[in-house]
Amino acid sequence: MMTCAAILLAATFTRPLERVTTMDPALAQSVYESRAVQLAYETVLAIDYVARPYQLVPGACELPEVSEDGLRYVFRVRSTELTAGEIVRSLERLRDPDLVSPNGWMLKSVDTIKALDDRTVEIRLTQKCHFFPWLMAMSQTGIRKTDGSGTGMYELSSWWKNHEMVFTRRKADADGGFDTIRYLVVDDASTKWLMFLKGELDFLAEVSRDNWDAIVDEKGNLDPKLVAQGIRMYSNSTLESIYIGINMRDPILGPNRKLRQALNAAFDYPRWEKFYSGRIVPSTGPVPPGIDGRLETPFAYSFNLEKARQLMVEAGYPNGIDPKTGRRLTLTLAIGRASQDTREAGELVAAFYDRIGIRLELSFHTWNAFLKAVDEGRVQLFNMGWVGDYPDAENFLQLFHSKNVSPGPNHANYVNPAYDREYDLAMGAATAEARNRHWWKCQEILREDCPWVFTHFNLANSLVRPRVGNYIPSCFPYGQECHFKVIDK
């Protein structure tokens, strides 16, 4: 007979997660915050958990009625716990000047948001926006009731900041979902792995480089010993674009395009791929493979050491030497955590740039301090990632529009009127074909200006223990635990 403690443990799903700094949907920025927010808050619309290609389904509201000109959206409230007024207030918080949400860019095409009655919301746009419904499925549209609480599947019952978050189910589930969700902050990758092996963690969203060889055999398949325990491994592509951002406001890097091109050409992707055990895809721009509108032509500044050295000469730093001082050019790379993996990755990047004479200093920060420094433009180079919020090239290309400079998502503070013009033309295009022509031009401009060092796109390799059912890999994993089922109670 199971004890009460054993039953409680069996109905609890535990996974590691990076630090969450806010549970306010309007302030959530990281993928980790988005995961937590969607457990506790319903979004206006939702992304189907099963369907591929991805498609939208009702959330707090039914799918919208859209006017013929694409400028008027009418949402009928579906949730019995929310009113149209609460939905309007929650969305308006995204552009509240007193709150200063970093997600205000989501409403840049919105004119008015009104409650027509208690069960109907009307949103009018200033210009047609083909992906607008997808924005309404993002975590940042999580609806807060008047008292600030949510109406999601779970509610936050305890939060020991920087250590643990516990969510308890608030909605009945006859299909056998987990009663409790625990997020644990575990910084050390080896500790995560040992906890997973001992059954203290039910899920690993990623496997560290150091532990990879212990997980797979020589063919890259899951080790038979793990298979015998019922452990499952899932490998899938993601919409996670990883890059080294270049602050265009920096007096050294901003005006010197040749120097930025050299940083790209010196980035040794074959060595980088080996460092990550082949679990990445090369990046030749910001738009991931598989997304309509991605530019597929070769990147002129892919790894080429000889070319990088010549670009350093053209940039005014032959062999990395600043002729004004006679000393090596020194740049600083800001990194948002100090784990073993990030330290080793940073040291490898420093080795790449040492080959062209640049001395790269690594500056490690806590995640909060890092985000603040990036938002305020107090960094020179910074290691960052962007996970697609919806499957559209625009979601990645808006990261470079001048309207979105920090504290918006354009953390590189890239400003180019020619780029803005092509982007705006794409947004107003009548067909996908016409839109893609402008997206391709945007990417051509970016590839020449190099406001990022384009490093890679992540591949996801998840490990799931046998007691967890109904796990489906997704590029949009926010709130996915709401769909999990308990197999071994």
Question: Where would I find each of the regions flagged by the language model?
Answer:
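Ligand/substrate-recognition segments at binding pockets and active sites
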Residues: R15, K161, P282, A315-G388
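Aromatic- and charge-enriched surface segment that lines or borders ligand/interaction sites
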Residues: L63-L99, E122, K192-K198, L253-P255
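Structural transition elements
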Residues: D250-P255, P282-Y317, R337-E344
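Gly/Pro-rich hinge or "lid" segments in bacterial periplasmic/extracellular proteins
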Residues: A46-A51, L125-R182, S190, L305-E306, ...
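N-terminal lobe/hinge region of extracytoplasmic solute-binding protein
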Residues: P16-E68, R89-E92, S149
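Detector for C-terminal structural segments
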Residues: L17, Y32, I242, N264-E296, ...
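Ligand-site clamp/hinge motif
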Residues: R170-E218, R359-E361
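Surface-exposed binding/hinge segments that line
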Residues: R76, P102-K145
